[in-house]
């Protein structure tokens, strides 16, 4: 999001009357709005089905991991392995392609995971984690975990990275980023 914010700031400096409307959602929400002409472009996190769009990969990656309370036993580990998650109450993204990505990372025992809650926006899941509802499978740096936050993030091992993608209906718009 920081890359988009910087580009928006440069554009607004040159054209001060531009107004922005930000919409946050999962890939399903954003592609629906793109298809209906309600948004001009979208920033996606892989995996996402963008087969009907022109897109470019942004020059950054993010990593998957687990958001948890700092006072839980897993917080002492530097990384989280598949077997560490067995028997724990998990909050996971409700996106179908994300489920496929995690099942590939986890391996044969994916069906044994105790996914108690699904979410479409991590902010809401982070409140559930903060209140002791479980552990959220998520991307790093979306929820604040520094300072006085009771939460921490631990990356998955083996590492599960994702790329950020920018898509737009009009190829000319891609030059703005």
Tell me the role of every PLM-derived stretch.
Residues 43-52, 105, 122-151:
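A ligand-binding cleft/hinge motif common to bilobed small-molecule-binding domains
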Residues 88-109:
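Secondary-structure junction motif
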Residues 26, 81, 120-121, 139:
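Short loop/turn segments at beta->alpha junctions
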Residues 54-65, 136, 140-141, 149-163:
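Short beta-strand->loop
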Residues 166-171:
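Conserved small/polar residues in nucleotide/adenosyl-binding loops
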Residues 1-50, 110, 118-119:
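Central regulatory/effector-binding core of bacterial HTH transcription factors
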Residues 52-64, 68-90:
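Flexible hinge/capping segments at coil-to-helix
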């Amino acid at each position: 999001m920081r890359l988009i914010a910087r580009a928006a700031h440069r554009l607004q400096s040159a054209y001060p009357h531009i107004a922005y409307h930000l919409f946050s959602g999962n890939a399903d929400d954003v592609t629906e709005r793109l298809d209906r002409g309600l948004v001009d472009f979208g920033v996606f996190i892989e995996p996402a089905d963008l087969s009907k769009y022109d897109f470019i990969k942004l020059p950054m990656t993010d990593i998957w991991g687990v958001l948890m309370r700092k006072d839980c036993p897993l917080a002492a580990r530097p990384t989280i392995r598949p077997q560490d998650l067995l028997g724990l109450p998990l909050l996971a993204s409700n996106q179908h392609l994300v489920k496929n990505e995690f099942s590939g990372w986890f391996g044969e025992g994916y069906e044994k995971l105790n996914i108690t809650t699904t979410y479409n926006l991590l902010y809401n899941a982070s409140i559930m984690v903060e209140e002791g509802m479980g552990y959220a499978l998520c991307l790093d740096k979306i929820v604040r975990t520094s300072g006085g936050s009771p939460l921490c993030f631990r990356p998955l091992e083996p590492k599960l990275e994702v790329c950020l993608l920018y898509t737009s209906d009009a190829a000319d718009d891609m030059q703005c980023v």
